[in-house]
């Protein structure tokens, strides 16, 4: 049986209104996050923003950072750096695995 779209955390299912209600934020705030390239939801065929569960988690994180006093520009940079760290950690892990494989074969 194929998984339901609700099982996919990356499936864009939720509208701006739904996310606004879930997180108790203004719809204008969500649009601003998109405009500032902080959280960029995909668009429906009709051009409406659609949020994934992962993007909703990201919006919640952004709200926490704003509550701590960060600006949207600073938050965007934090998110970029966190993404870069995850990429570098994955690369490091792949290199460690390759070294272990080479050492085992030596």
Regions found by a protein language model. Name each.
Residues 2-12, 21, 35, 40-41, ...:
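Arg/Lys-rich, alpha-helical DNA-contact motif
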């Amino acid at each position: 049986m194929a998984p339901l779209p609700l099982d996919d955390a990356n499936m864009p299912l939720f509208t701006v209104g739904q996310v606004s209600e879930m997180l108790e934020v203004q719809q204008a705030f969500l649009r601003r996050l998109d405009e500032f390239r902080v959280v960029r939801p995909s668009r429906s065929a009709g051009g409406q923003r659609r949020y994934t569960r992962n993007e909703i988690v990201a919006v919640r994180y952004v709200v926490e950072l704003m509550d701590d006093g960060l600006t949207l520009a600073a938050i965007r940079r934090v998110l970029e750096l966190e993404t870069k760290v995850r990429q570098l950690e994955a690369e490091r892990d792949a290199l460690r695995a390759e070294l272990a494989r080479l050492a085992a074969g030596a």
